[in-house]
């Protein structure tokens, strides 16, 4: 029995260690600011959504351990008093307060908090296309933190005609939905850049231009860092 209990204890140590680490990590604060010369409807998953006129800021708290988090701007929206409506880009099921991810195209600020080696991972992604310029800035002064990343190019004005939609620029994956462009199926483990992804990378070198663009597009900060996301700035 003693040996059995010892075996169980050893098996639980890694889980307990991760749990105890998580206790000391607070929720991250995200300040989301609109510096565009037009109104946007900010969206966050988790977090919901809110209308932001130029200069306004929306602050949300995101629990430690959150994965698959993202922030984006919606444009061309109209909502009724109940919070139902539509957006030209970034729409999330017709809801002002988003309960999930939005529709393409949308420029994304993505993150995963308190992950491997007690790090946050963050990036800007054009895998879902582009609608609004964006920057993401950790507030930490830790030298191990990458710092501000941006995608401030006016991609909409330069978008290839076959990817252009009202208010945005689709990615090739969103436009064609093929294994080659989406890095799925036969291309899942052997997926390189295409002329389309090279276009996006040329406009925003720090951003994901396609699904496997990890090497130059993923950044880290120590867990417990807060972040600022700014549209058009």
From Swiss-Prot:
Strongly expressed in roots and in female and male strobili, and, to a lower extent, in cotyledons, leaves, stems and pollen grains. Disulfide bonds join 36-232, 77-87, 92-98, 145-221, 151-204, 159-169, 173-182, 183-191. Residues 1-22 form the signal peptide. The keyword Signal applies. One of its GO terms (biological process) is defense response. Glycans are attached at residue 195. Keywords: Allergen, Disulfide bond, Glycoprotein, Pathogenesis-related protein, Plant defense, Signal, Stress response. Transmembrane segments: none annotated. May be involved in disease resistance. Belongs to the thaumatin family. This is Pathogenesis-related thaumatin-like protein 3.2.
